[in-house]
Regions:
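Glycine-rich phosphate/pyrophosphate-handling loop used in enzymes and phosphotransfer proteins
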Residues: 1-238
């Protein structure tokens, strides 16, 4: 088996999924790892929006005007649309390049840099519609959530929250358009499995939060006691 591994490494040497530099294993290289911007205080204690400069955590204007249905949303890292993070570059290869070999790397990063205490009754991924699921072949959020659930010894259900209809991609839409786009797009398959439970909703990225907010609203309508949100990366300029 070691000979096979050695031969594969010789023919297909491991490379950093962000910059394509050769590495000892499938992992972000040291330069790309150091270029990731962690999501740190000061931030909104509700949605996790990051604020520039110093000062204490405080609620953002968005959460003051329209309190979300989730209790907390947190990201492991931040990125800007004009300066993509190496973590997002790797995520795009996983998600759009359908490179499932990156699932363990990204899932481990999510678990190891998780800013939340994971004591929830249930971990649920943001679901894909059937057309996207068939095209991609997997739900990236489900792969991330399952890895964290197994590692933390928590229950995981990829089928409990479902999309009732296909929605156009959120990319390029404004905040109000994003909310309308996903309005009533989700449903809970078994309300008894959600009732009075604490739920951690997992996704890959968060921009304005419209999708996770609609998911949280749907879960609360089904009787969930509390919904938190965990994502790999969050847009710092949404």
């Amino acid at each position: 088996m070691r000979a096979v591994t050695w031969a594969l490494d010789l023919l297909f040497p491991p490379r950093c999924p962000a910059c394509d530099r050769r590495t000892e294993r499938v992992a972000l290289c040291a330069d790309c790892t150091s270029a990731i911007t962690p999501a740190r205080s000061p931030l909104c204690p509700v949605c996790g929006e990051s604020f520039p400069g110093g000062g204490p955590d405080h609620r953002c204007t968005r959460c003051l005007i329209r309190p979300p249905h989730f209790a907390r949303a947190r990201a492991c890292a931040l990125y800007r649309s004009d300066h993509p993070s190496p973590l997002v570059e790797a995520l795009h290869r996983f998600k759009y390049g359908r490179d499932v070999t990156l699932a363990p790397l990204l899932s481990a990063y999510l678990d190891e840099h998780c800013p939340l205490s994971i004591d929830h009754d249930l971990l649920i991924p943001v679901p894909l519609d059937l057309a996207r699921l068939r095209w991609r072949g997997f739900n990236q959020a489900a792969m991330l959530a399952r890895f964290v659930a197994v590692r933390r010894g928590r229950r995981f259900d990829a089928m409990l929250l479902q999309r009732r209809r296909a929605t156009p991609p959120q990319v390029g839409l404004g905040e109000s358009e994003r909310r309308r786009n996903v309005a009533r797009a989700f449903a809970v398959r078994d309300r008894s499995a959600v009732r009075n439970r604490t739920i951690l909703l997992v996704d890959d990225v968060m921009t304005t939060g419209a999708t996770v907010e609609e998911c949280a609203r749907t879960l609360h309508s089904a009787g969930a006691r509390r919904v938190d949100v965990l994502v790999l990366a969050r847009a710092a300029d949404a």
